[in-house]
Amino acid sequence: MGRRKIEIEPIKDDRNRTVTFIKRKAGLFKKAHELSVLCQVDIAVIILGSNNTFYEYSSVDMSNLLNVHQNNTDLPHNIIEPSDYGDYVKKPRVVLNERKRRRRRATVLQPASHSGSCTVSSQDSSSVQNNGNLSAPLASNDAGNAGVSTPLVHCHGAISRSGSNHSDCARNSADYQMLQGGLNSGGSFHANDYKESVDQQHVANEAIHRNFMNKRIRPDTHLLLSESNHSNYHNFYPSPYENLPKPSLPASLVGNIPSFQSQFVQVIPANSNPMGKGFNGTGDSESFEAKQKIHPTVAISNTLEGPAPVQAMVHHLHQLNSNRGKLSGKPYLKLNIPKATNDACQRSPAMYSGTASPKTDVQATPNQMLASNMSSPLSRSKFLGFKNNDMDDLYHNGRCGSTYVNNKTFFLKPPIGRPPKFPKSPSSSIVVFPSSVASSTLKSTSSTNSPD
């Protein structure tokens, strides 16, 4: 980046003159030294300052160099005078007027044809400076050019608004009115009224845009606000299912069916606010709270009445009542053993107690084993004991693991793994098989129930 050229003339300011002298003197001495070293020449520089001070630089002895310069006439002298560099005459000052620069920048480029190309105004710079006139902005009424030219239009003329079409262009051209207050007969306005005209035009553009926004299709808010006394906010977007025919319910089910809420389904109204905040759409503030409620057992008279949705609801209520009845009491298991067979079966593993050692071998009777607490080493789940195929006489202590039916001993073997959470069918939860072990030879390691 080069330095700008300055005008060579005497500096009138003392401070600027002193600074310029110091800088240029140092530069001159530096160049003289570089020249003497690079080119192997003798250089002597003498400067007499304005303060009557000599500033000298010499690559050799100054007195010897001056003696040779004055006395030796045989040496040629190449003398350069100030006229060899040209006569520096003061040029006319270039005055930068900010007001004129703004006028030139705001000059309107008028479109020469419908294609949008622009040409510079025919007025020259002298007429602009003398009269201060600017060409007036012209409204573009072409159907293919959707936009209005402004005083700050760039090189391609019209400015198109995004989303505008031919109908927007026709509406804008019909509603837009040029401001004629500041225009003169020559089709231009004075520069003094430039700012006011621009502000007025900006206000007019905002009014056009506001009118365009008002013409958009919107729902009738007056009818909606008139019915805003009750909080039916879903009426803004009506559901298409409201007009469908609804099935009729029999008279026996109308009084017994509550609102469809259970421990499995949580129903929240469409116009409720789950967070507990209020709606301020129409000025009123209402808060809604959705709580999960479990209704008591419902008595259904007849499950075959009513349409299919009602039957599904009745089935759901029956299932709910059944689950509540099961969960209210202890889990139980019904096991039916028709008769004992003499087929050879897998022998049951030995029963060990948690307190006794497996090495202890103590004989026990079936009655003692039924009364004892036993568990299988394969699983820590609880067993249910039965006697004489009687399902009502149950050992419900959860520790008995055998039964005595028709002189045969049966063991209840639970599945290996995690026991079921809810009672299931016997075929999938417990396997029952007879044992060929005689009742007199049964082994038990329970030290507390063993005979003395």
Swiss-Prot record:
Main location: nucleus
Pfam families: SRF-TF
Signal peptide positions (record): none
DNA-binding positions: 58-87
PROSITE patterns membership: MADS_BOX_1, MADS_BOX_2
SUPFAM superfamilies reported in the protein's UniProt record: SRF-like
Compartments, as annotated in UniProt: Nucleus
PTM characteristics: Phosphorylated by HOG1.
GO cellular component term, pick one: cytoplasm
Record's keyword terms, sorted: DNA-binding, Nucleus, Transcription, Transcription regulation
Gene3D superfamilies: Transcription factor, MADS-box
Region feature Disordered, mapped onto this chain: 97-142
Statement: the UniProt record of this protein carries the keyword Nucleus: yes
Protein family according to the UniProt entry: Belongs to the MEF2 family.
Role noted for this protein: Transcription factor that controls part of the HOG1-mediated osmostress responses. Binds to the DNA sequence 5'-ACTACTA[TA](4)TAG-3'. Does not appear to function in the MPK1 pathway.
Protein name: Transcription factor SMP1
Species per Swiss-Prot/TrEMBL record: Saccharomyces cerevisiae (strain ATCC 204508 / S288c) (Baker's yeast)
Lineage: Eukaryota, Fungi, Dikarya, Ascomycota, Saccharomycotina
